[in-house]
Amino acid sequence: MSITTERKQQLIKEYAITENDTGSSAVQCAILTERINNLTEHFKSNHKDHTSRRGLLILVGRRRRLLNYIKKNNVSEYLDLITKLGIRKIK
């Protein structure tokens, strides 16, 4: 259900701007997207888990705010990130 340490390190390495970058907006969005995808898979077999569904909505909102921040500051980075993550544009 949660992402493993190895998977998180892979995401950090893939989306990091510099070598020691673990907290940039792109890395945070990638980790949140992975958590959202895991929860989405969880709901395919546990459709009555309403507490986790609330957690999912909180994660989606947090990712949306981060993506808005990236879009406001650097549009080209935003477009690259959403194509890499496979998510739709924010209106």
Swiss-Prot record:
CDD domains: Ribosomal_S15p_S13e. GO terms for biological process: translation. InterPro entries: Ribosomal_uS15, Ribosomal_uS15_bac-type, uS15_NS1_RNA-bd_sf. Transmembrane segments: none annotated. Pfam families: Ribosomal_S15. The keyword rRNA-binding applies. One of its GO terms (cellular component) is cytosolic small ribosomal subunit. Keywords: Ribonucleoprotein, Ribosomal protein, RNA-binding, rRNA-binding. One of its GO terms (molecular function) is structural constituent of ribosome. One of the primary rRNA binding proteins, it binds directly to 16S rRNA where it helps nucleate assembly of the platform of the 30S subunit by binding and bridging several RNA helices of the 16S rRNA. Forms an intersubunit bridge (bridge B4) with the 23S rRNA of the 50S subunit in the ribosome. Part of the 30S ribosomal subunit. Forms a bridge to the 50S subunit in the 70S ribosome, contacting the 23S rRNA. NCBIfam families: S15_bact. Belongs to the universal ribosomal protein uS15 family. This is Small ribosomal subunit protein uS15. It comes from Rickettsia typhi (strain ATCC VR-144 / Wilmington).
